Amino acid sequence: MSLQGSYQHFCLWMFLGTTLALGQGQVSSRLRLAVLPEDQLQMKWREAEGSGLGFLVQVTPMAGDLEQELILTTKTPKATVGGLNPSKSYTLQIFELTDSGPILLARREFVIEDLKSQSLGRGSRRLAGATLEPTSLPLRGPDSEKTSEPSIAFTLSRDLPILDHPQFQCTPPTPADIIFLVDGSWSIGHNHFQQVKDFLASIITQFAIGPDKVQVGLTQYSGDPQTEWDLNSFQTKEQVLAAVHHLRYKGGNTFTGLALTHVLEQNLKPAAGVRPEAAKVLILVTDGKSQDDVRTAARILKDQDIDVFVVGVKNVDEAELKLLASQPLDITVHNVLDFPQLDTLAPLLSRLICQKIQGRGPVKPAAGTRVLDPLPTPTRLILTHATSSSIHLSWTPALYPPLKYLIVWQPSRGGAPKEVVVEGPVSSMELGNLTSSTEYLVSVLPVYESGVGKSLQGRATTAPLPPPGPLTLAAVTPRTLHVTWPPSAGVTQYLVQYLLATSTGEEQKREVHVGQPEVLLDGLEPGQDYDVSVQSLRGPEASEVQSIRARTSALGPPRHLTFSDVRYNSTCVSWEAQRPVRLVKVSYISSDGSHSGQTQVPGNLTSATLGPLSSSTMYTVRVTCFYLGGGSSVLTGHVTTQKAPSPGQLSVMELPGDAVKLSWLATALSGVLVYQIKWMPLGEGKAREISVPGTLGTATLPGLMKHVEYEITILAYYRDGTRSDPVSLRYTPSAASRSPPSSLALSSETPNSLQVNWTPPSGHVLHYRLNYTLASGSGPEKSISVPGTRSHAVLRDLMSATKYRVLVSAVYRAGESMAVSATYRTAACPALHPDSSLSGFDLMVAFGLVAKEYASIRGVAMEPSALGVVPTFTLFKDAQLMRRVSDIYPATLPPEHTIVFLVRLLPETPREAFALWQMMAEDFQPILGVLLDAGRKSLTYFNHDSRAALQEVTFDLQDAKKIFFGSFHKVHIAVGHSKVRLYVDCRKVAERPIGDAGSPPTGGFITLGRLAKARGPRSSSATFQLQMLQIVCSDTWADKDRCCEIPALRDGETCPAFPSACAYSSETPGPPGPQGPPGLPGRNGPPGQQGHPGPKGEPGPPGQTGPEGPGGQQGSPGTQGRAVQGPMGPPGAKGEKGDQGLSGLQGLSGQQGIPGKTGLQGPKGMRGLEGPAGLPGPPGPRGFQGLAGARGTNGERGAPGAVGPTGLPGSKGERGEKGEPQSLATIFQLVSQACESAIRTHVLKLNSFLHENARPPMPFMAETAKLGRPRSIDPGLHNEALLPGDWGHILRPEDQGEPVTISHTSNPRLQEVQTPESLE
């Protein structure tokens, strides 16, 4: 038979089986009955016009069963009743409820089996083996929602085979134990739980139940699991189905992990009916994520060789489902979008479970496995060492050690259980992270290869959280209390609460959380009592309260007035004050009342400096603190200033002629206005005196006669009029031989130093004194001392290019000689090379462009030069050579200089301008440098003038352009005061005027090859070759240079030969030749001159001791010894307890803490009681379009319309793409949808035809479906005949597409498919 013919017969068969025979009588003619799967009865009746308050459906059995009633709301003329006995007789009565009482609408007696027979008789012409059974939404009782009406859909029955296949019945060859673990939490609800029961019954129906076949057990779980019946509780299928029917809904939370542990502990015991030889299957049905850990129990179940199937509904955690289920996951994990879809999953899941059992075969214990029945259990569970967060467990192991132990614990008052698996033969462990003061129920389960033994249980209570130790006041001020306490073990933070002792309301109590066992309470009132309490916290747990009453100190006067750093004109006064102080006033007055003053300091300071004061005077000092409430009492003290300090360390140095130089050390740091110096001979003669400024420390005293003793006196006058005590010494100018050094010579080694050399005088010199200062006399004079055995010294840290005056004198025991002097200017630049007299800077060395350093510089390459020993360095575009000015120029660049470079421009040199060498400021702005522009073939020198304005000079003559022709050229740029000269290959090319240059910066950067348009520290460079780059500190070097590096300009007389030259000219001397043959003996020469003295002989024996010589002169003072710290000595004895220290200052207020993290979501609350019925809702939305009405009479024929113009032919469309081949599953699904749509259309048309005169038109049916992608079917997993309704469940959720709405028309061959976008 063709596929089209089969489809027509199949649709005809389904259409004929849609209506059951109606009973006789006018009342019964308004009632229609239909039998649904599992002996449910669906009824529909017609409403009377003006329906009353509702309907009462009463189904009364003839005998035996209880009466079941269902009250429906208005406009719901249909209902479904389940749980009926198919062989018993029932009476069905339907009443309309009105204000005057119930009115009978319909009455009928029926037997389920008779209704089935009538349906089969009327469908004798249908295809054999198929039936159509109506299915309804879940059964709704009086408590169900009343906002929606039941609707009818028609599906293929799965109780009968399709196309002559026998009905599916699983009779496995080996016994099987199937345990259902059903989620009964609040999230399921009563209505959906009924659908879960239907789902369980659909699975159980397809298995052969019996003691030697398949046994079924069931456990329902929520907050705590409960075994509804064990495996051996029922012997027949009817008993099991009856138990499913009477299964009651529990409600509660979702603790799947605890339920799995319950299965291990209770349902898999031999006493529960588990057979060792039977295959074991666990089927878990849940609709939510577990609130406890499931991994441990799931792993043990799978290790026990138990096949775990998981069925998830709605928003379940798919990752958790895969964690629970056995392998392979595509068979054992199933997820449906809603509870009504469980009915369609049952046939497929039954076949998969059957195939799994059949594939396992009989279970046999492994070789060497010891079968224990009953399984041994440990004994004597002891719970000890209970702390606030832990309990120690110990037990006596069983005689036969298990593979592992499963430890489960939870609070006895309820809460999420936790579990852990302990491997190996252990008998103790410690449970941590527990809650304090909580009783725990602990279970220990041994796990064997053959199952789980009986649990060993015990109870223990954790200790309370330890409170803080005794509170202690560490510091007290008027505004703060510093409280400390011993820390508590296992505490994360402390809660500190404090309140005025006189307060009566708790609302004034303040609290603070701290992490350390101390707290500083601030913002308190002075002189008040406070009650302070502290609690230990660990998460939500709190300990008992530890309290203390403390009192803040009252405001008072300052204390402990002390004086320090007492000088002749000032002193520092300090005090202690209580906080908070706004202002402190300090006043002082001299003892005679002639001098007084006062000062004010902020309240956060505790000291002040008083001055100016008079020397050697006693002062009375008074300190007053001012608070918010006023001033404190006065604290008084006395202090006496010191004498004005006198100059010290006087020394005299004899100068040439009749003058001497007096030197002294000023003991006062500042304040000296003038020094008064007086000298007079002790015999006859007049006294003389001079005054010098207070900033000096030396003075020249003229007119002193030889061999005359003088008394020299000096005293200091201060700015406040105070005079120091005079200081004097006696000095006699002597004519004794105190010869000064001679031949004083100065030279400049570096720009910052001077080399001083002299010829020592005759006589024993103790040391030499070197005084040096600026020749202009504007700066201070400095002095150094040189040992008498040396005749040279180096003066360092000098300014470059600056003239200095240096004086050198010899110091004898009898005094100091006259000083010899000389002046010299420090160098502006260092020597260009160590053995060169030319001064300047070699920038090749400064930038590391030498053979030993270039390899570490990016973008630089080196190659030997054919012109000589100087190598050639190539700078590429990625070379970024930059150095700080201070690293290259230790001194300032002189205004007259010459820039010398030997350069070659390459073909890849950019055509834009680049700076061969330039100086930049800190902001990378050019200040001084040389630009080469290969595009314009010009050379530009630029600098800043004295006004910091940029000035530049450009050379673009023909002789200058040859620099850009690709050969090496030596270029000199001589910069003078008013002009710049350009030399190319040691020949003057041009001269340009330029203004005076400003001083180049001592900071900034120096770069090589930087592109002129570049900005910032990172920039590109030009590509060129460089052999030489120097700056000579002279503008005349270009006229002296001979350009020996250029072969065409070499002169054999002035230029040395290249050591590495391959060929030599006739003008250049060659290397020495080989040694010639020995010559003939010569004549005897004249007598030689007297030879040099021979080497020193060996020391002779010691001589006899000579007489004692005269006493030697006093030696010079030795150098100061260096103290070396010795090893640390042993600790000394403990000293006596010191006085109590001063109170610390008030700390600053801490910053406000960041908000804590959001807490975890609490567990779902218990379902509340059902509320009263609400008010009627607003009118519903507009309904669907009704069915088409009866055809009307033909209207009059209209006038013919005008003929329109002939349209242009359209363009030929493009050929469509080849369609993808569809799988058999997709074709079958489309055929099924089309068939069902046609049947529904015909049913609606039939109903409309039968009742078109009695009721308004009904809306046509619309169903929501999802278009999916084709998916191949594994024939190895689905070897049973699949029912048509099963194809949709083989498609996974991820294979389904967007929802579409299929509207069925009156023509079964026409279907309008509308996407969600087209419906808007």
From Swiss-Prot:
Entry GO terms, CC: collagen trimer; extracellular region
Ranges of Polar residues composition bias in the record: 1302-1320
Domain Collagen-like: 1069-1122, 1125-1174, 1165-1221
Principal cellular location given in the protein's record: secreted
Pro residues composition bias: residue spans: 1069-1080
Chain intervals with Low complexity compositional bias: 733-748, 1081-1093, 1140-1152
Claim: Ubl conjugation is one of the keywords in the record: no
Domain VWFA positions: 177-352
Superkingdom as given in the UniProt entry: Eukaryota
Glycosylation: residue positions: N433, N569, N604, N771
Range of residues in the leader sequence: 1-25
Free-text function comment from the UniProt entry: Probable collagen protein.
Name of the protein this chain belongs to: Collagen alpha-1(XX) chain
Species name: Mus musculus
Gene that produces this protein: Col20a1
